Amino acid sequence: MASIELRNVQTELAAKNLQFKVLTEKFLEQRKELFDAKKTDSNVEYVECLSEKLRVATERISDLEKETKEGKQVANEEIGRLEKLLREAQQKRDAKIDESYQTFLRIELLVANLGESTDPENEKRIKNLMPAAKTGIPPEGVLRLTINALDSAARESKKKTMAIESLTKQVDDANKLTEVYMKRLEELEDKHRFEEALTLKIQAMMIETTGQLEAQKKIIADLQKKNDDLMKEEEGEEDYEEEENYEVEEDFEDEEEYDEEGEEEDYE
């Protein structure tokens, strides 16, 4: 914008200079004609007309000189202002170009380290890479490379996102499976606690039953002992009766033998 305004001022100044040159040449021509007329003293009206034209031309030239001087001053001031604007615009353009290179390099570093934490050394790396980037990449090519880098970053980001989604799904599935196993574990723990309580109860019953059995055994042993004692007493009485019976039987047998002998003697 500033360069266009500067060219317009320069064009306008050149046009005024050309106009001044034409008028100057015309003035010199008319002045020559006037001098020639004065030398011959002919055609007074023509001379007066030329004098008037000369006066008008002189005034016009004076005005043009004044305008030109003022125009040059204004033009110089305008040129100075426009040159300042041009320098500022150039500085801004250079800053934008540097910013474009920095953006490109920053994206390149981002793509290279996608998913990792921000490296504080990136700014130093960018400063070190800037000269090589400016040498190898024209300013008009930075935008295209930046777009390509952004596309690459988008692709990498999409891959990372898909990987994260896959891992998230795996984690969710694992959590669901963990919940199922935890529920089963709780059920098993409940069952184990029930079985443990039942086992303790059975053990208590077994201990109680064992105690009762021991008591029963003791009672049975006592009864057995008493029974044995009674049996021994009964066996003692039976032996005594058997001995008596045995003696009676012997006496009876002796008597029978004696009777048989007496009968035999009588028979004889």
From Swiss-Prot:
Residues 231-268 have a biased composition (Acidic residues). This is Protein atz-1. Residues 171-243 form a coiled coil. GO terms for cellular component: nucleus. Plays a role in meiosis, germline development and oocyte morphogenesis. May play a role in DNA replication. In the germline, involved in the maintenance of transition zone nuclei and in chromosome structure and organization, but not required for mitotic proliferation. Keywords: Coiled coil, DNA replication, Meiosis, Nucleus. Residues 229-268 are annotated as: Disordered. The keyword Lyase does not apply. Its main location: nucleus. Disruption phenotype: RNAi-mediated knockdown results in embryonic lethality in 10% of animals. Surviving animals have a reduced brood size and abnormal diakinetic oocyte morphology. It is found in: Nucleus. GO terms for biological process: DNA replication; meiotic cell cycle; oocyte morphogenesis; positive regulation of brood size; positive regulation of chromosome organization; positive regulation of DNA replication; positive regulation of meiotic nuclear division. The keyword Coiled coil applies. The gene is atz-1. It comes from Caenorhabditis elegans. Transmembrane segments: none annotated.
